[in-house]
């Protein structure tokens, strides 16, 4: 398996991207990594690792650039070069921690959408009390219609099925209440269609339900999804900081912390977003993974692991089969 990685994308590029990639090569012996970036940055890696290939790109798409404009103007950027390698089937998946909008625009323009999907969705995995849940969309589409939400549900169903090993993942529709009549017209229409579908739809779910793991797939538009994602990241960070402050307050709290250190480490690990890798762009014709913009080596390593699992489990073809089998159910 060959994975292409944008060495120039993200807040901590290129150092942390390179570090995470080299760590992945040590751990996974059945992968090759193609690092894409500026020659002056990557040249020193030449010959360092047998399964590491280098592809030079003269440009970088920055986080503050207008996505579509940057994609069209910077044809030799590390991001677009990586997507072109994927299009030519020279690699099996592409991963970037760079500009999210540019990655989505570039993927759409370069690779295109799966037949039957109107809009691709960003689908991160969130930690929950009972395991994890897939959230989609997490920021790609701020305005969605009911048909988009039903399509997200179908893709999320397959993704959770393959990544979590659950035959009938529970699908919940994010809303301001669990009652069927709650929400705007788009959400109400999506509820009706999901209820008629073959998916394991459990109804509406509220924000407080998500951390408890009431379902394996949470469906919403990208505006709401991004707010959920960032809120959960912030809460996890605050809880971690509060625990650290309280457990180091004095000698007695420090002694108590020693007694529960094992449990604390497990909790911290479970709530750490870097453990969950990146978010696939579901609905794109080829495997594209978006790593968190703030990713350091550990997060990049886990995003590579996720990309590998995505390809190993043939998630993309299973999504295509699911979309085809649901047919008219996806047309609202």
From Swiss-Prot:
InterPro entries according to UniProt: FA_synthesis (IPR003664), Phospholipid_synth_PlsX-like (IPR012281)
One Gene Ontology term of the molecular function aspect: phosphate:acyl-[acyl carrier protein] acyltransferase activity
Entry EC number(s): 2.3.1.274
Subcellular localization, as worded in the UniProt entry: Cytoplasm
Entry superkingdom: Bacteria
Gene Ontology CC: cytoplasm
A Gene Ontology BP annotation from the UniProt entry: fatty acid biosynthetic process
Catalytic reaction(s) noted: a fatty acyl-[ACP] + phosphate = an acyl phosphate + holo-[ACP]
Pfam family, one: FA_synthesis
Keyword Cell cycle (UniProt): no
Membrane-spanning ranges: none
Pathway(s) the chain acts in: Lipid metabolism; phospholipid metabolism
Keywords, sorted A to Z: Cytoplasm, Lipid biosynthesis, Lipid metabolism, Phospholipid biosynthesis, Phospholipid metabolism, Transferase
Entry similarity comment: Belongs to the PlsX family.
Role summary: Catalyzes the reversible formation of acyl-phosphate (acyl-PO(4)) from acyl-[acyl-carrier-protein] (acyl-ACP). This enzyme utilizes acyl-ACP as fatty acyl donor, but not acyl-CoA.
Protein name (database record): Phosphate acyltransferase
Species this chain originates from: Thermoanaerobacter sp. (strain X514)
Lineage of origin: Bacteria, Bacillati, Bacillota, Clostridia, Thermoanaerobacterales
């Amino acid at each position: 398996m060959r994975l292409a990685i944008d060495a120039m994308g993200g807040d901590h590029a290129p150092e942390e991207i390179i570090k995470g990639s080299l760590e992945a090569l040590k751990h996974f012996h059945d992968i090759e990594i193609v690092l894409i970036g500026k020659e002056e940055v990557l040249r020193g890696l030449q010959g360092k690792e047998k399964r590491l290939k280098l592809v030079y790109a003269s440009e970088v798409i920055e986080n503050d650039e207008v996505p579509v404009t940057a994609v069209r103007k910077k044809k030799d950027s590390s991001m677009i070069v990586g997507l072109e390698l994927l299009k030519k089937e020279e690699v099996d998946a592409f991963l970037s921690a760079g500009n999210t909008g540019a990655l989505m625009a570039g993927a759409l323009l370069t690779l295109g959408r799966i037949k039957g999907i109107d809009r691709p969705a960003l689908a991160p995995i969130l930690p929950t009390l009972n395991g994890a849940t897939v959230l989609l969309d997490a920021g790609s589409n701020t305005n969605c219609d009911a048909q988009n939400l039903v399509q997200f549900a179908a893709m999320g169903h397959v993704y959770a099925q393959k990544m979590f090993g659950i035959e009938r993942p529970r699908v919940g529709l994010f809303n301001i209440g669990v009652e069927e009549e709650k929400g705007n017209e788009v959400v109400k229409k999506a509820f009706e269609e999901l209820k008629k579908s073959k998916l394991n739809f459990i109804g509406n779910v509220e924000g407080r339900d998500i951390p408890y793991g009431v379902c394996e797939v949470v469906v919403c538009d990208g505006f709401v999804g991004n707010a959920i994602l960032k809120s959960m990241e912030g809460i996890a960070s605050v809880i971690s900081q509060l625990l650290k402050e309280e457990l180091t307050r004095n000698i007695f709290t420090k002694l108590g912390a020693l007694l529960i250190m094992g449990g604390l480490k497990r909790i911290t690990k479970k709530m750490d977003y870097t453990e969950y890798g990146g978010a696939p762009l579901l609905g794109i014709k080829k495997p594209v993974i978006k790593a968190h913009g703030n990713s350091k080596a550990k997060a990049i390593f886990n995003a590579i692991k996720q990309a590998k699992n995505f390809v190993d489990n043939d998630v993309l073809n299973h999504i295509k089969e699911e979309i085809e089998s649901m047919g008219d159910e996806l047309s609202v």
